[in-house]
C-alpha cells in the first residue's frame, strides 16, 4: 500500500509532502514527493491511497487514562479491554497504556492478571499499564479511594508485575511517604517511577529524582502548586532535564495560559499529553463510577460529589486539538507530545510513536481542521 501526496509528520518533528509505503503491516519507506515517486507508484500493483490535502500523523499513544465508552481498566475483564481498545482506535489512539486506580489489593492483582493475559482482537495495541496508586499520599488522593492507600511494598509490586507479565510500565509514588525512596532504589531501571498524588516539597522531590524518579503524573494536579518560595514538585521536575511531565489539556484541568507557560518552561520534548479519561468518555452526561466512587459528568467536567475533579471525559485526540486551538501550541509540538514522547517514555518507540521504516503502520489521516478522515492500525483501515 502507498499513501500518496500526504503532508507527513516525520520522525524529526517536521512536515514533509511525501509518499509512505506500507508492507506487511509496517512502514517500509517514507519518500519525499517527486516525479520519480509518482512513476514508482504507478508501476506497482499496490493499493494507492490518495492523501492529497490530508495530514498524516502517527497513531497517538495515551499512557495515562482509565477508560471510555462505559468500560474501565479496573473492571478487570477482557470485554472491558475490548471496548477500550476499540474506542481508542476509533479516535486515533493506536497504542494504549491504561491506568489502574487505588483499589483493594486482591482486586488490583486481578486487574493486572486480566491485562497480562489479554489477547489482542484488533483496535489499539495494549502496550502497558500505568499503576496509579496505591503508593500515594492520603492528603493528595484526588479521586483515589483513601481506604486503599498503602505504603510502598516492593514484594507486592513484584507480585503485581508478575501477574501482568511485565506489562506495568509506570508506577506512581508519593516520595514523602515512608519507604518511598527505598522503593525507588529497588525498581528503578525496570519501570518508570512517576511522582504523583504527592504533598512533597522541593527537596524531597529532588531526592526522589536523584534516586531514579523520572516522570511527573498530571503536572499541577494532586500536588502543591508552584510557589516562588516553595517550588515543590513542579520546580524539582522542571530543574531535572531527565524528567518528563504529563499534562491533561482538556480545558478543565489546566488553563491555556498555564499550558503555554509550561511548554515554555520545560520545552516540548519533555511534555507528554495524556487524557486521564474515565469511562464516561464517548458517552452522554450522567452518573458514572471511577475506582468505586460515584462520578457526575457534565460536558468535559467529571467530579466526585464533593466537587473533586475525577479524571476527564475527553479523549487524547481532543486534548491534542485543544492544545493547538485554544492554547496556541504549534501543531508539530502537540503531535510530538502525543506520539513520540509517550512512546519513548515507556520504551515502545521501536514499534510506535513515529512514521518510520520498520515500525507498525499505525497512523491517522486528518484534514486541515484536524478532523479524523481515517485511522490505520497495522496497515489496515479501521472503522471510526
Spans of features found by a protein language model:
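Active-site core of metal-dependent hydrolases
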Residues: 162-283
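Active-site gating loops and adjacent loop-to-helix segments of metal-dependent hydrolytic enzymes
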Residues: 86-97, 137-165, 207-219, 230-244, ...
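Divalent metal-dependent hydrolysis catalytic cores, especially in the metallo-beta-lactamase
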Residues: 66, 82-111, 124-137, 164-176, ...
